[in-house]
Amino acid sequence: MKNYQINLKKELNSIYPTLEHLQGVNPNGEHISFTNHYMMKDEKPFFGICGEFHYSRYDFHKWEDEIIKMKMAGINIIPTYIIWNHHEEIKGQFRWDGSFNIRYFVELCKKHQVEVILRIGPFVHGEARNGGLPDWLYGEPCNVRSNDERYLFYVKRYYQEIGNQVRGLFYKDGGPIIGVQLDNEYCHAGAPWEMTTGTSNEWINNGSYDTSVEEHHHHIEILKEFAIEAGMIAPIYTGTGWGGAQASPDTVLPLWGGYAFWPWIFYDESIKEHPVTPEFIYRNYRRLLIILNRLMIRLQCLLLAVKWVEG
C-alpha cells in the first residue's frame, strides 16, 4: 500500500536591500531605500500612493485646496510634469510666475507633508502641445530626444533653470522632492508637432532613431548627469518601464504607469462601452459591511427578545 504525504511548509522569499544607487537621507536622519520587494522609508516598508497634479495646468490660487483634497484621499506622493513649452514659450525667455511657479507648488506640498516627484522631461507627452517641447525647437537644426549636441545644449539650459527654481527643496535638504523622472516614454511614444497638423503632419520621434540599446541608455545617463549638475539631487531617478521604453535600469528605476480608463480606445468609433482593464483592480467592501451591519442589528434584536422572554 502506498504512503502519501502532504507538505504544507512554504519557503518564505528572502528580503534583502537592493538598488543602492537609489536612496537618500534627509537632515532628520530619515532614510529612503529599497529592498527586492518594496520601498522603505526610515527602515520601514512604505507604500507610495501617487496622484498626478500638473501645476501649470491649474490656477495657482486653487493649488492648496487641491493638494489638501488629494492628501485626504490617501495620496502621499504627487508627481508633476514640468512642461517645457509652458515655461519657455519664447526662446530664451523663461516664466516662473503665477501658475508657472513650481517653487510655490512644491512649498505647498511640503507644508502639507506630501512628497513630490518632478517629471522634468524634456519631453513629457502628457497630451501637451508637442509633448511639452517648445514650438521654437521645431525650427532648430537638431534631432530632439537624441544625443545631438544642439538639442542637449537647450536641455541642459532648461534643466539649469528648473534647478534654480527648486533649490533647497529636495529630500536631502529637508524638502519633499524624493524623485526626478527623466524624459517620459522614451523609445515608446512620440507626439505630433502641433503646428504641422493638417499640413505636413510631422511627429516628434519617440527617441529610438534606430540606434542601439546602449545608445538609448547613454541618453538617459546624460539627462541624469545634467539634472545632478543643475542641483536636482534626489534619492530616486525614474523612467518609463513599459511598452519597449528604454529606462537604463542601472541609472534609473523603471516604473509602470497603469490606466484604469483608456481614452484612446474610443478613436475606434465602433467601441461604445469601456471594457474592464487589468489595471482596475477593485473590490467593493461596502456591500459586505452593509450585510454585516444588518446581521448585527438582527442579532441585537434577537438578544433583546431572549432577555425579554427570560425576564
Question: Where are the regions that the model predicts?
Answer:
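N-terminal carbohydrate-binding accessory modules
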Residues: 1-77
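Substrate-binding/catalytic cleft of secreted carbohydrate-active enzymes
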Residues: 17-18, 24, 118, 123-154, ...
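Acidic-and-aromatic substrate-binding clefts and catalytic sites of carbohydrate-active enzymes
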Residues: 30, 55-61, 87-88, 92-97, ...
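Conserved, mostly hydrophobic/aromatic
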Residues: 43, 70, 78, 109, ...
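A short, structure-level motif marking secondary-structure boundaries and short turns
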Residues: 50-52, 89-91, 207-210
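Conserved residues at the C-terminal ends of beta-strands
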Residues: 52-54, 81, 183, 239
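Glycine-rich anion/phosphate-binding loops
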Residues: 58-64, 95-101, 152-160
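Aromatic-lined substrate-binding rim segments of carbohydrate-active enzymes
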Residues: 63-131, 135-136, 220-229
